[in-house]
Amino acid sequence: MAKRGGKRTVGVPYRFHVTPGIFMNSLVPVADNSGAKLVRVIGVVGHYSKTVHRRIPGAGVGDMVVVVVREGKPELRKQIFRAIVVRQRRPYRRPDGTWVAFEDNAVVIVTPEGDPKGSEIHGPVAMEATLRWPTIANLASIVV
């Protein structure tokens, strides 16, 4: 019989299925005070695009992505960081049946371990991101 379970994620032991709304080469604004203003997504952590032919990696709320800073402080530009998706415009369905969509896409710059680089987060943060990343929940002023 096959083994059940698999890789564990940080935070909750399971991951909500969120419809991907941010894909490779997307330009996404940053929702914290780390100094970056606009980033480009260059990868999705945990997504293996080489195993499925021509599938473009996509990320939803709560996913960690690899980004490069396009606009912001000069010392941060052209640097590669990790980020967590905290808002997406594409609607996704929660387990209770409600549909959620935000006005914009947004990410928060984090360390590879998942600790935020900034000290505050601007705007609302999705509940799925706070459940998966508790350190982001501590900085969030509004959780939707």
Curated annotation (Swiss-Prot):
**What GO molecular function annotation could you give as one example from this UniProt entry?**
large ribosomal subunit rRNA binding
Q: Which family does it belong to?
A: Belongs to the universal ribosomal protein uL14 family.
Give me the Gene Ontology terms describing cellular component.
Answer: cytosolic large ribosomal subunit
Q: What protein name does the entry list?
A: Large ribosomal subunit protein uL14
Annotated function? Binds to 23S rRNA. Forms part of two intersubunit bridges in the 70S ribosome.
User: Source organism's superkingdom?
Assistant: Archaea
**Mind listing the UniProt keywords for this protein, alphabetically?**
Ribonucleoprotein, Ribosomal protein, RNA-binding, rRNA-binding
Source species, please? Pyrobaculum aerophilum (strain ATCC 51768 / DSM 7523 / JCM 9630 / CIP 104966 / NBRC 100827 / IM2)
Q: How does it assemble?
A: Part of the 50S ribosomal subunit. Forms a cluster with proteins L3 and L24e, part of which may contact the 16S rRNA in 2 intersubunit bridges.
One Gene Ontology biological process:
translation
Gene label: rpl14
InterPro entries given in the database record: Ribosomal_uL14 (IPR000218), Ribosomal_uL14_arc (IPR019971), Ribosomal_uL14_CS (IPR019972), Ribosomal_uL14_sf (IPR036853)
